């Protein structure tokens, strides 16, 4: 989990509009979502707890979690989901289930780059971040 800690600035996003569309996000929210480049901040809270915060001019969301334990999360598009985060072989796996669709996010750190691959059904998005702190 150590490799994921810090502040990450989004540099590139490919296919995010299709992910939002598949999740049923309305047109206006999709357009706003495509314009912003959020920072991702991952913090160790101690005692096996972590916080993941996504900050942008459009919206800020955060969740606190323990690896391997389910928790409730509100997504940036305001869906309430049951989430689970694990780390296996250097890959952070994040599952979000809103009871109609399941979103799978895999995050991998290579040097100062974090790559998040987002999948909903057969639709795939790749978001790339660079480490800033």
Curated annotation (Swiss-Prot):
Positions bound to hexadecanoate: 107, 127-129
Pfam family, one: Lipocalin
PANTHER family: FATTY ACID BINDING PROTEIN (PTHR11955)
Acetylation is among the record's keywords: yes
Protein name: Fatty acid-binding protein homolog 1
SUPFAM superfamilies the record matches: Lipocalins
Recorded superkingdom: Eukaryota
UniProt xrefs under PROSITE patterns: FABP
Family, similarity comment: Belongs to the calycin superfamily. Fatty-acid binding protein (FABP) family.
Gene Ontology MF term list: lipid binding
Disulfide bonds: none
Keyword terms: Acetylation, Lipid-binding, Transport
Function (record text): Has been implicated in the acquisition, storage, and transport of lipids, and may be important to the organism since it is incapable of synthesizing most of its lipids de novo.
Classification via Gene3D superfamilies: 2.40.128.20
Domain notes: Forms a beta-barrel structure that accommodates hydrophobic ligands in its interior.
List of residues that carry N-acetylmethionine: 1
